[in-house]
UniProtKB/Swiss-Prot annotation:
It comes from the Eukaryota. The keyword Phosphoprotein applies. CDD domains: PIN_Nob1-like (cd09876). This is RNA-binding protein NOB1. Gene3D superfamilies: 5'-nuclease, Nin one binding (NOB1), Zn-ribbon-like. InterPro entries: NOB1, Nob1_euk, NOB1_Zf-like_sf, NOB1_Zn-bd, PIN_dom, Ribonuclease_PIN, WRNPLPNID. Belongs to the NOB1 family. Transmembrane segments: none annotated. The keyword Kinase does not apply. GO terms for cellular component: nucleus; preribosome, small subunit precursor.
Length: 413
């Protein structure tokens, strides 16, 4: 396996002790990745690496580009600031050594196309009339007695929802034709029983099992991984969100064992109130029912255009705890903080007043910088008395669950 020329390593590669010297020639990372590693064993391995680890920080324009792209794919909430910098460094190296003409500027949206066949529709459901169900076999119709025809007409509707009865005579004849006239004796069966069991055990031990020696071959057969060929820049990561963004952009993703990952997860938003789906990952409220009930679901699209959604069995995904509580009384005014309940809800713009703008006028002759000991500290305005902070700093309702128990009988200082 030819090593990749430039490899960007994430924290997962160091935690899993990946042999990066066998994967790539030049290994890059950022300093925040090393600072994330806390365990002693990994830090000891980082102190005596068998290769040169190069630290490089990405340019701000690439960080901005990757951030906007991850918002379009829906993976931005799952990415940390360090993850975005690792993605930006991979994009930067690809632009320096390969180019950006083959990279995508917009992610591919999941398209749901209708098909004539309905493979997801159950065919054999008792009590339901399904038009797409195949007709009963002709053999059973031909061998009917003519006298029973008027009786069958009254119950012809049963043929739509009941499975056709198996023809036992035909099955017995097929078994006799396959088996032949030679029937083994019981004594011979008992004698050969032990030999057959031993043969089966030996066959089970040899084939059908996934071992470290054949796991790469099985992954190649499943078309999930491949041997990297003519790859100059790649990223080694174990984060699914990072893999999805890299593959959507057209960058190369490498597994910990050095294999090239071809497929990753695609996501859509599904409303668990009206069960409608949308591929616009920037939405917060459902476009059909208007509720804040959108959940991210991983999907795969088959060749015939059918959409298969993969739901999580974790009950915490749809945990209704904290959803039933009394809403506060709506308040008006510039500094009112009301919960965001609908998509078209209007909020105050919180613009600075004219007096506040004059304080921050840097071109004024009497302007005093904030670091100066003579700078004014606002303690008399309405926003200061209400302790209104900027919304980007976490203002508003900070408690996630209003029904959570509060601490009582706290001693006051």
């Amino acid at each position: 396996m030819a090593p990749v020329e430039h490899v960007v390593a994430d924290a997962g590669a160091f935690l899993l002790d990946a042999a990066l010297q066998d994967i790539g020639k030049n290994i890059y990372t950022i300093r925040n990745v090393i600072s994330e590693i806390r365990d002693k064993a990994t830090r000891r391995r980082l102190a005596v690496l068998p290769y040169e680890l190069r630290f490089k920080e990405p340019f701000p324009e690439y960080v901005r580009l990757v951030t906007e792209f991850s918002k379009k794919t829906g993976d931005y909430p799952s990415l940390s600031a360090t993850d975005i910098q690792v993605l930006a460094l991979t994009y930067q190296l690809e632009a320096e050594f390969v180019g950006v003409s083959h990279l995508k500027q917009e992610p591919e949206k999941v398209k749901v196309s209708s098909s004539i066949q309905h493979p997801e529709t159950p065919l054999h459901v008792s009590g339901f009339h399904l038009p797409s169900k195949p007709k009963p076999p002709r053999e059973t119709v031909e061998h009917r007695h003519p006298a029973s025809e008027p009786e069958d007409l009254e119950f012809s509707s049963f043929m739509f929802w009941r499975n056709p009865l198996p023809n036992i005579d035909c099955e017995l004849q097929e078994l006799l034709m396959d088996g032949g006239e030679d029937v083994p004796n019981e004594e011979e069966d008992e004698e050969n029983g032990l030999d057959e069991r031993q043969d089966e055990d030996s066959d089970d031990d040899g084939g059908g099992w996934i071992t470290p020696s054949n796991i790469k071959q099985i992954q190649q057969e499943m078309k999930q991984c491949a041997v990297p060929k003519d790859v100059r820049v790649g990223c080694v990561t174990t984060d699914f969100a990072m893999q999805n963004v890299l593959l959507q952009m057209g960058l190369h993703v490498l597994a910990v064992n050095g294999m090239l990952i071809r497929e990753a997860r695609s996501y859509i938003l599904r409303c668990h109130g009206c069960f409608k789906t949308t591929s616009d990952m920037s939405r917060v409220f459902c476009a059909h029912c208007g509720n804040k009930t959108l959940k991210k679901v991983s999907v795969t699209v088959s060749d015939d255009g059918t959409l298969h959604m993969h739901f999580s069995r974790n009950p915490k995904v749809l945990n209704p705890r904290g959803l039933r509580y009394s809403l506060p009384t709506p308040k008006g005014g510039k500094y009112a903080i009301n919960p965001h309940l609908t998509e078209d809800q209007r909020f105050p713009q919180l613009r600075l007043s004219r007096k506040a703008r004059q304080k921050t006028d840097v071109f004024a002759p009497d302007y005093v910088a904030g670091v100066s000991p003579f700078a004014e500290n606002d303690i008399s305005s309405r926003s200061a008395t209400l302790q209104v902070r900027d919304s980007t700093l976490g203002a508003g309702r900070r408690r996630l669950n209003p029904n959570a128990s509060r601490k009582k009988f706290v001693k006051k200082r």
